[in-house]
């Protein structure tokens, strides 16, 4: 429902490309791109911590070359607008590349916002902790529903598929 709501709000907006922010924004990016009929999809990955230590500046692990962003209207998709640090860093980098960033997120958490700014588009406001069905590391150990991918060890990618029904069903099918 949140993706549908956000897609409806964005449907009249012209975008040249969609930039999904890893990790939490990648699945919403794919769903929004599908809903909007967008084909030019890029990704960005930003790191603010090394281990437990906060870094003084964000480190971009992945970002599109400036030439792909220059003169483009870029829909930046974040999974959650929480402290705003990630969105701020990505937005600034798109601007430095000569692009026009427009930030969209499913939930906006105004109470956690560290600066007086808001996403350009969002589906809903919330104060709640947001846990998406695809964020398996947020689930208590051993509580993965059957049918879900589960991590096979610390720091390892989900590989084992358990038998059973899918993790999460919506009225429109499996998500």
Model regions: which residues?
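PRPP-associated nucleotide enzymes
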Residues: 1-175
